[in-house]
Swiss-Prot record:
This is Uncharacterized protein MG219. Residues 83-148 are annotated as: Disordered. Residues 92-103, 113-124 have a biased composition (Basic residues).
Length: 148
């Protein structure tokens, strides 16, 4: 089956390289291979008012002649260049991150301070055990509070 009609094709490169071009769009559907090919052919002035034949026998069961207006679509102007354009790779910008301020402003002085309490922990346990024993003065005060 061959279906021919006009269709708008979005071909955009840049605004400066565009011109209006009248294009005839042909679509060829191959039922056996289930493939679709689309071609664009530049229209001549004699073809502008030509009716378009659409074969729709596979869908409706008959052929129709339909008059389709010509569409003006932007197409890029092809410029010949001696050498291909070389596009430099885009370098990624580093993300802005907050710098973490160090917790230890003077690591040498604090490291010595941290080692001293670790060594004095056994001494502190002994001190706590001695504090836990009530003295004679504390026992008299605690007895008075409990009796009254």
């Amino acid at each position: 089956m061959r279906t021919s009609y006009l269709k708008k094709i979005p071909i955009m490169n840049s605004d400066s390289d565009l011109k209006l071009q009248k294009v005839w769009i042909e679509r060829h559907v191959d039922q056996d291979e289930l493939s679709l090919t689309t071609t664009a052919v530049e229209l001549k002035k004699s073809d502008e008012q030509k009716p378009v034949a659409i074969k729709s026998s596979d869908f409706i069961g008959h052929e129709e002649l339909i008059s389709v207006p010509v569409l003006l679509i932007p197409t890029p102007v092809v410029k010949e260049i001696d050498q291909p354009a070389v596009i430099p790779p885009v370098k990624a910008k580093p993300k802005a991150t907050k710098k973490k301020t160090p917790v230890k402003s003077k690591p040498t002085s604090k490291s010595t301070k941290q080692t001293k309490p670790k060594q004095s922990k056994p001494k502190s346990k002994q001190v706590q055990q001695t504090k836990a024993k009530p003295t004679q003065i504390q026992t008299k005060k605690s007895n008075k509070k409990t009796r009254s």
